C-alpha cells in the first residue's frame, strides 16, 4: 500500500470537522490485498450438524454477535446461541406475538458475558428483548422511540443504550441515547438524512470496528453520501469520510476499520 497513489485528502469543513474525501477518478488500477492486511489472526468455527443447530435462514437482518466465549446468530426459527467451539447451547426468542417474541426478524444483537445477558433488537419494534445466556427471558428494555432496521450499542457499565435508526420522514429520531428504563437522554433528528419517500430497500451501517460510533446510510438509489462519527459532547453526527463520484455515483456502502475505509 505504501507505493499506491494518494487518492484522498483531508478537508476541514465550515464546522471545523476534518473529513477524508476520496476522489474516485484517481483510482486507476487494482491491487491484491492479503487478508493479513486487515486481520492478524482468524479461526473457522464449525457450528455442528445437529438439527437444532442448523441456521435455516438469515434474511431480514442476519444479525451475528461474537463475544470471547459465545456466538449468536439469527435464524428464521429464532436466535441461536453457541459457545466458542460451535457447540449449540439454546435458542433465544422466536417469531410470534408473545411478550418475548419478534414479528419479523432479529436485526441486531449484543452479547454481554460479564452480566450474563444477550440483547436482541427486532427489525421493527419498541423494545429490546433480553435473555440470560442459558436462554431464560429477562425483563425487556423499552425503547424511547420505535425503531426500523435499527442498530444499537450497549454501555453495560453506565447502563446506557446508543440506538441508530433508519432516517425515514416519519422517524422521531435517527440516533439517540437512553437508559435501560427507556428514559431519553440525547437524540438527533434525521434532518438532511431523511429518506423520502420511505424505502425499505435502504439500510444503515453502524460497524463499530473502532472506538468511534460510526453511522452511514446505504441508499439503493445511487447517491453521494457520508460516513459520520457520533460526537457525544456536541450531540451531533460529525462527517468523517466520503467519496467524490463526480457526476456518476454508483451503488455503494461504507465500512470503517481501525486503519482503513472500505467502499463496497
Where are these regions (language model features)?
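Repeated scaffold domains used in trafficking and secretory/extracellular systems
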Residues: 58-63, 103-109, 146-154, 195-208, ...
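Blade-loop segments of beta-propeller domains
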Residues: 48-60, 78, 82, 87-115, ...
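Loop-centered beta-sheet repeat module
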Residues: 173-231
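Asp-box/WD-like beta-propeller blade repeats and closely related beta-sheet repeat scaffolds
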Residues: 103-104, 121-173, 184-196
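Short loop/turn segments that connect beta-strands within beta-propeller blades
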Residues: 83-87, 132-136, 178-183, 230-234
Amino acid at each position: 500500500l505504501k507505493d499506491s497513489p494518494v487518492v484522498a485528502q483531508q478537508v476541514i469543513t465550515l464546522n471545523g470537522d476534518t473529513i477524508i474525501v476520496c476522489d474516485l477518478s484517481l483510482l486507476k488500477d487494482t491491487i491484491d490485498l492479503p487478508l493479513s492486511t486487515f486481520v492478524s489472526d482468524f479461526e473457522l468455527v464449525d457450528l455442528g450438524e445437529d438439527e437444532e443447530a442448523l441456521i435455516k435462514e438469515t434474511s431480514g437482518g442476519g444479525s451475528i454477535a461474537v463475544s470471547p466465549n459465545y456466538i449468536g446468530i439469527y435464524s428464521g426459527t429464532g436466535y441461536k446461541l453457541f459457545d466458542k467451539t460451535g457447540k449449540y447451547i439454546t435458542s433465544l426468542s422466536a417469531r410470534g406475538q408473545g411478550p418475548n417474541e419478534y414479528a419479523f426478524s432479529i436485526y441486531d444483537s449484543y452479547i454481554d458475558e460479564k452480566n450474563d445477558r444477550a440483547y436482541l433488537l427486532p427489525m421493527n419494534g419498541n423494545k429490546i428483548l433480553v435473555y440470560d445466556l442459558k436462554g431464560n427471558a429477562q425483563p425487556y428494555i423499552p425503547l424511547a422511540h420505535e425503531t426500523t432496521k435499527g442498530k444499537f450499542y450497549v454501555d453495560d457499565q453506565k447502563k446506557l443504550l446508543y440506538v441508530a435508526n433508519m432516517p425515514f420522514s416519519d422517524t422521531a429520531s435517527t440516533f439517540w441515547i437512553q437508559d435501560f428504563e427507556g428514559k431519553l437522554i440525547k437524540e438527533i433528528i434525521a434532518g438532511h438524512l431523511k429518506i423520502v419517500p420511505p424505502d425499505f430497500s435502504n439500510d444503515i451501517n453502524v460497524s463499530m470496528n473502532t472506538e468511534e460510533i460510526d453511522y452511514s446510510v446505504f441508499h439503493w438509489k445511487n447517491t453521494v453520501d457520508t460516513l459520520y462519527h457520533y460526537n457525544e459532547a456536541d450531540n451531533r453526527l460529525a462527517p468523517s469520510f466520503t467519496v467524490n463520484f463526480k457526476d456518476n455515483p454508483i451503488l455503494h456502502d461504507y465500512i470503517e476499520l481501525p486503519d482503513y475505509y472500505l467502499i463496497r
